[in-house]
Amino acid sequence: MEEEIRKDFLELMRLMDEGKIQEFKQKANETPPVDIAEGLEEVEDSGRVLKLFRMLPKDISSDVFAYMTSDQQQLIAESATNAELTALVDDMFLDDTVDFLEEMPANVVKKVLQNADENTRKLINQFLNYPENSAGSLMTIEYVDLHDYFTVRKAMDYIRRTGIDKETVYTCYVIDEQRRLVGHVSLRKLIVAPESTYIRDIMDTNTVSATTTDDQEVVAEDFRHYDLTSIAVTDKENRLVGIITIDDIVDVITEENTEDIKKMAAIIPSDEEYMDAGVMHLVAHRLPWLMIMMISATLSSTIITSFESVLAGAVVLTAFIPMLTGSAGNSGSQTSVTIIRNMALGEVELGDWLRVLWKEARVGVVCGAALAAVNFLRMMIFSGTTVVISLIVSVTLMLAIVMASSVGCLLPMGAKRLGLDPAVMASPMITTIVDAASLLLYFMIASVMLGL
């Protein structure tokens, strides 16, 4: 926790402990809800967590609750009275309530639903039925919708009356009499337009939207591609049912990037926070791929064993194996990360595989030649090896870099073609293939050049 945030939170705790209620509420109103929630994460005493939360002003307690960890949310939900729980759910945005309930055990979900009003309960159940990680599970129904026959005056009056309870008023979505999405209009355009103008005359009909079943990664890509702050969500009949705002998509992007990074490092993704995870939990998510890579490394051992005669004739070759496999592995990893990232951004398509291969092969040739030249001079000057040995190692290094660059681009694209996650191929598969291929190249070149 940053020093300034920690200082503000400690001040809140001091005011709470000293019973200075008015000063506490004033300080709480001046502190961002997310900072209060972050401070509560470090409080181990559940009694103090409950006490501080109950002292918060009612107009910010729901915002703080939305940012709290699922464990602390469960603590508060189980400890709250029916009246407190009803007030909390009523004050929260619906999408935040659904996010909270998705992490809760059945007894907490039941308690929350029992204390929600009938309409809210119906909406929550509807949201919980949407597929996980879909646009429907992310959206909120707290948005401003305007009929196309509204005048600007009527639209502004409507926004003033209802806008306080909406997640955003900066983009208003326009619907027809059947609630079908027909366009959108910005608050800026409403402010500058004459009051007698009809919404249909100033709205933008080129509206980007998602359906309730769209995957959250697709929605996130739309936000990035079109520079959106919100997106409309429609059903199969193009009727407006909700919107997704940028704050929820930022969370999605963070989750997806974290998941991809873990996969690329051969770690099974987990939703649990690192500091909250137990040792055996971390072991369970790392050990499977470590086992797979250890067993697959047998291929490299087999290759070395097969060329024992070459090594016996030139033992010095053994010293350069780590450098060759390490350099090739690094090159393959650089290429795979670049390709995976560009595929995720939509800048590289499967149909581009030949162009990508040609480009990466040329990059590999240039990088490999540069490394080989430097390595040859290094070996001649500092290692004291013969010209032949220096050439064997340097030529192998260049070819291994070219090979690794090619494998690094083809494996992720091949994985995507087969419907697999390209990130899974980044570290474990590339390491195994590149190591084995580099050793094979090394010993074959050595056999030819040494006549063994």
Question: How should each PLM-predicted stretch be described?
Answer:
Residues 294-311, 372-385:
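Juxtamembrane "helix exit" motif at the C-terminal ends of alpha-helical transmembrane segments
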Residues 1-268:
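Hydrophobic packing positions in regular secondary-structure scaffolds
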Residues 414-434:
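Interfacial loop-to-transmembrane junctions
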Residues 275-291, 350-369, 393-394:
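Soluble-to-membrane junctions at the N-terminal ends of transmembrane alpha-helices
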Residues 336, 411, 416, 438-450:
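Membrane-helix cytosolic exit motif
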Residues 248-282, 333-356, 413-419:
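Non-transmembrane, extramembrane segments of multi-pass ion/lipid transporters
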Residues 289-297, 320, 324, 328, ...:
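Alpha-helical transmembrane segments in multi-pass membrane proteins
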Residues 306-321, 383-395:
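Membrane-water interface of transmembrane alpha-helices in multipass transporters/channels
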